[in-house]
């Protein structure tokens, strides 16, 4: 009550921010007549003037009014488009490290030109981030004439571009690209073997379009570059054949419930659980299929891999549905993005799930992958010095933007008042009744010339509505992942009178639906249109536009509520752009997944008690409240998951930053001999201390063991026993120094043979190679630790603290191994002629280039990860030989010192 009163008196924080910014808008408006008088050359000269003032120490904030006035005037001359006052407000919000919520149709793309220009003046680069390649290319090409008029360069960063082209794109003042591509380039740069292979500059300012989609919907989606593991496709096929024999039961067994089935599904957490009966049956089936010894338990350590396959196959059959979660096209399983309804070509689920779905669908099974490098979007975008974003719907997620990214959300007012009529939800008992009511509404709306957009949450639902409309004789277009290529054309005509368009979720996001259709699309179809033709098309469009407005504008129909209110608001936001008329209504049924999983049973029983007749809908505050509560519950749960993921990933992130900083330092220096000398001392001291403990009696020394170790690990044959026999006064300190001197001397002789420059290059190459190999192994170990750490909770320990403690110990151990492996490899290397060394180096580079070309990018969704497949490293499966295990060849040596050693 008190907060409401204070807000009434002083205004909300949003109001106060906008009030402050409006004063700056007034300043910019007062400058307009002055800037209109400037010639084109004088206007272009402003960029050089601003840069000179920045160099003298003036701040961007001081330059902002003039810079914005410059962009506005340039836009009027280049595009014949003038930035509205609200777009200037949006530009200021974006410059202040905030999220700007701007409604659909308010011109976010044009708004972005303001802060992009201002921040590009620093010469440190601006990254404009979009959700797909089409939008990146479209926005870059659309805005290029404006930026180039003002003397700024524009780059486009797209998948598959060669490194020199990417480097050029990143060197531009303003670079357009997708979130995935920026992230993958960052990871690839940190796997480079020379400074020339890197493409990115230091991350300065990121301007994220559709920021909610990237920083929230995809926050649980790590970007991963991975290499193939061993082939286990045969096992997936065998396990897949057994799953249909298992019967699903309604819920999990408990003290009060004992089912007759073999597994239960928890739809909330998207997990599958075997029952006791199910475990007995699957063990029996696995034994019969000769996949497991009779009498063995599926949960025994030797069957961990088998358990993994059974779980993946069960999830594939019980949780993942064709045409909802994925489609099968050209013998390939392609994931469908649950947030946009778009297909995600090349992306793959991890943890063997994708292979299990491929086995289920009977298509070719591709190899599993092992992580070589990974980062989440949360941590990638927090690397930028300055981050801002814009979207049509951010206010519902303002708390998350603030708590995770430290970004405030400012709601920018619309240029014209919003007059869309959002009608109350209608709730039906069954889905069939709901579909019937939707068709009736469509028939009524199109009868009076109103265009209709029907939003569905999956391809399956969009095809169901499409079939029913076809049966009812209503013409319509379907926009879903299967017809992705036609997206722009369908969206362009979705505003025509009586047009009916069915779209999955937010397909076509980023493209406005213009009432009366798109006149630009009509002109684009003509080759070299004349002025007269253009005027004729515009006049015909204006007539259609007015007719559609008179009919009520675009009507939105939601076929069910999404888990997030934000996605519902995005669907509604397609209508009522720029003050146009429009309306929206959601049709729900008690069979909808949100209602079934999250809304209470009380609502269903209440509706039954009301004695609803078939086809009758209910509009009741209780039902609306129950739906809102269900959505809030899901949003809160999803936020907790993202927050927890971030807390765990922050541990890995600190280590990642340390390793990548070390790696970049290595790349940038030409001489690492000092570092090698320093770690050689550490390694030899630790090795000698293990056999000759400091300040110990000679009787405690294991001289033979030390001699053997020096030969095995450092290829260093020293007569230590003879030295001690001949020189009784030789104590441990002088012995330690002599061993180190001998090691350095042997190394120097090798250096003389191959030459100093060649040796420096070789040292650097070995350090990078060893670092990459150990980091890859460390990532796999961290992954295993993360998967089982929650079990520590049963021992009354905090899993997060345990994870931090153990991962730090693992990291420290990895750094020690790095020192040891580098010195061991350099000591054991066989000296060859300089020409041979050069040939080997060229061979290694050629191999690295070949592997880089083979990279394909993919993306894990929900639980998994975004993977980029490369054959860079061969990863092992369940029974991998550990580096400290005995070598399988039977030599008796450790694997790392025998067939597993670095060549």
Swiss-Prot record:
What does the function comment of this entry state?
Answer: Part of the Sec protein translocase complex. Interacts with the SecYEG preprotein conducting channel. Has a central role in coupling the hydrolysis of ATP to the transfer of proteins into and across the cell membrane, serving both as a receptor for the preprotein-SecB complex and as an ATP-driven molecular motor driving the stepwise translocation of polypeptide chains across the membrane.
Q: Which domain of life is it from?
A: Bacteria
Under catalytic activity, the entry for this protein gives:
ATP + H2O + cellular proteinSide 1 = ADP + phosphate + cellular proteinSide 2
- Report the co-factor binding details: May bind 1 zinc ion per subunit.
Tell me which UniProt keywords the record has, alphabetically: ATP-binding, Cell inner membrane, Cell membrane, Cytoplasm, Membrane, Metal-binding, Nucleotide-binding, Protein transport, Translocase, Translocation, Transport, Zinc
Chief place where the protein resides: membrane
Q: Where in the cell is it found?
A: Cell inner membrane; Cytoplasm
Q: What is the species of this protein?
A: Photorhabdus laumondii subsp. laumondii (strain DSM 15139 / CIP 105565 / TT01) (Photorhabdus luminescens subsp. laumondii)
Query: What PROSITE patterns does the record point to?
Result: SECA (PS01312), SECA_MOTOR_DEAD (PS51196)
Binding residues annotated for Zn(2+), in chain numbering: 887, 889, 898-899
> What EC number is given for this enzyme?
7.4.2.8
Which SMART domains does this entry report, sorted A to Z?
Answer: SecA_DEAD, SecA_PP_bind
- Please give the name of this protein: Protein translocase subunit SecA
Q: What induces it?
A: Repressed under conditions of excess protein secretion capacity and derepressed when protein secretion becomes limiting. This is regulated by SecM.
Topologically, how does it sit relative to the membrane? Peripheral membrane protein
What are this entry's molecular-function GO terms? ATP binding; metal ion binding; protein-exporting ATPase activity
GO CC term, one of those recorded: cell envelope Sec protein transport complex
**Family under the similarity heading:** Belongs to the SecA family.
User: What gene does this protein come from?
Assistant: secA
Q: Name one GO biological process term.
A: protein transport by the Sec complex
Pfam families per UniProt: P-loop_SecA, SEC-C, SecA_DEAD, SecA_PP_bind, SecA_SW
Q: Which residues bind ATP?
A: 87, 105-109, 512
Q: How does it assemble?
A: Monomer and homodimer. Part of the essential Sec protein translocation apparatus which comprises SecA, SecYEG and auxiliary proteins SecDF-YajC and YidC.
| Cofactor needs | Zn(2+)
């Amino acid at each position: 009550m008190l907060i409401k009163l204070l807000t009434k008196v002083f205004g909300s924080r949003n109001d106060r921010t906008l009030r402050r910014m409006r004063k700056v808008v007034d300043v910019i408006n007062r400058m307009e007549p002055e800037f209109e008088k400037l010639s084109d050359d004088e206007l272009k000269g402003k960029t050089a003037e601003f840069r000179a003032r920045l160099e003298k120490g003036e701040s961007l904030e001081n330059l902002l009014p003039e810079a914005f006035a410059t962009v506005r005037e340039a836009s009027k001359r280049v595009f014949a488009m003038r930035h509205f006052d609200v777009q200037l407000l949006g530009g200021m919000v974006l410059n202040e490290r905030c999220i700007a919520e701007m409604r659909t149709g308010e011109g976010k793309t044009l708004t972005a030109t303001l802060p992009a220009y201002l921040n590009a003046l620093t010469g440190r680069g601006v990254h404009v981030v979009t959700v797909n390649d089409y939008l990146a290319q479209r926005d870059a090409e659309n805005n290029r004439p404006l930026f180039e008029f003002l003397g700024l360069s524009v780059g486009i960063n797209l998948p598959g571009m060669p490194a020199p082209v990417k480097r050029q794109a990143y060197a531009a003042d303003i670079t357009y690209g997708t979130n995935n591509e920026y992230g993958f380039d960052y990871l690839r740069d940190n796997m480079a073997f020379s400074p020339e292979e890197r493409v990115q500059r230091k991350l300065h300012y990121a301007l994220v379009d559709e920021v909610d989609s990237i920083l929230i919907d995809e926050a649980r989606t790590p970007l991963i570059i991975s290499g193939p593991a061993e082939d286990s496709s045969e096992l997936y096929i065998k396990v897949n054949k057994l799953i249909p024999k298992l019967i699903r039961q309604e819920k999990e067994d408990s003290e009060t419930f004992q089912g007759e089935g073999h597994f239960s599904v928890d739809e909330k957490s998207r997990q599958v659980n075997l029952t006791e009966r199910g475990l007995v049956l699957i063990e029996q089936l696995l034994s019969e299929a000769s996949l497991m010894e009779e009498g063995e338990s599926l949960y025994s350590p030797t069957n961990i891999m088998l358990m993994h396959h059974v779980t993946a196959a069960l999830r594939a059959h019980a949780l993942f549905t064709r045409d909802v979660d994925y489609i099968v096209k050209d013998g390939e399983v392609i994931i469908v993005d649950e947030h946009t309804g778009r297909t995600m070509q090349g992306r793959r689920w991890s943890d063997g799930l994708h292979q299990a779905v491929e086995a289920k669908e009977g298509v070719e099974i591709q190899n599993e992958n092992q992580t070589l490098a990974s980062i989440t979007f949360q941590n990638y975008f927090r690397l930028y010095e300055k981050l801002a974003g814009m979207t049509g719907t951010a206010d519902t997620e303002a708390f998350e933007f603030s708590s995770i990214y430290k970004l405030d959300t400012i709601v920018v007012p619309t240029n014209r008042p919003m007059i869309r009529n959002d009608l109350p939800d209608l709730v039906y008992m069954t889905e069939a009744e709901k579909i019937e009511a939707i068709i009736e509404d469509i028939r009524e709306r199109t009868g009076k010339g109103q265009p209709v957009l029907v939003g569905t949450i999956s391809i399956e639902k969009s095809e169901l509505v499409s079939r029913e409309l076809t049966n009812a004789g209503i013409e319509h277009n379907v926009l879903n992942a299967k017809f992705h290529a036609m997206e722009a054309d369908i969206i362009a005509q979705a505003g025509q009178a009586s047009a009916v368009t069915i779209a999955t979720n937010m397909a076509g996001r980023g493209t406005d639906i213009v009432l009366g259709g798109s006149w630009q699309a009509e002109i684009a179809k003509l080759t070299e249109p004349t002025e007269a033709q253009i005027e004729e098309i515009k006049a015909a469009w204006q007539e259609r536009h007015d007719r559609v407005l008179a009919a009520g504008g675009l009507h939105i129909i939601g076929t069910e509520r999404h888990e997030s209110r934000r996605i519902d608001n995005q669907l509604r936001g397609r209508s009522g752009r720029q003050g146009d008329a429009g309306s929206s209504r959601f049709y729900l049924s008690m069979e909808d997944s949100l209602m079934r999983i999250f809304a209470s049973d009380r609502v269903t029983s209440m509706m039954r008690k009301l004695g609803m007749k078939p086809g009758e809908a209910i509009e009741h505050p209780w039902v609306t409240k129950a739906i809102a509560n269900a959505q809030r519950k899901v949003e809160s749960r999803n936020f907790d998951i993202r927050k927890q993921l971030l807390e765990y990933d922050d541990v890995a992130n600190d280590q990642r930053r340390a390793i990548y900083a070390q790696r970049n330092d290595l790349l940038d220096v030409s001489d690492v001999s000092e570092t090698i000398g320093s770690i050689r001392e550490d390694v030899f001291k630790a090795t000698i201390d293990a056999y000759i403990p400091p300040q110990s009696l000679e009787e405690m020394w294991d001289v033979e063991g030390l001699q053997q170790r020096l030969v095995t690990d450092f290829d260093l044959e020293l007569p230590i026993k003879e030295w001690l026999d001949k020189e009784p006064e030789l104590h441990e300190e002088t012995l330690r120094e002599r061993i180190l001197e001998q090691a350095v001397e042997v190394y120097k002789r090798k250096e003389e043979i191959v030459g100093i420059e060649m040796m420096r290059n070789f040292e650097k190459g070995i350090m990078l190679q060893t670092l990459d190999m150990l980091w890859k192994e460390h990532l796999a170990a961290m992954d295993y630790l993360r998967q089982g750490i929650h079990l520590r909770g049963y021992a009354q320990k905090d899993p997060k603290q345990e994870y931090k403690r153990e991962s730090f110990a693992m990291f420290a151990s990895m750094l020690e191994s790095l020192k040891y492996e580098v010195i061991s490899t350099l000591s054991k290397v066989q000296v060859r002629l300089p020409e041979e060394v050069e040939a080997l180096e060229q061979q290694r580079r050629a191999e690295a280039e070949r592997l880089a070309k083979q990279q394909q990018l993919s993306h894990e969704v929900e639980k998994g990860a975004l993977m980029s497949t490369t054959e860079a490293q061969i990863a092992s499966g369940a029974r991998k030989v550990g580096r400290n295990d005995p070598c399988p060849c039977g030599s008796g040596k450790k694997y790392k010192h025998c067939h597993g050693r670095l060549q």
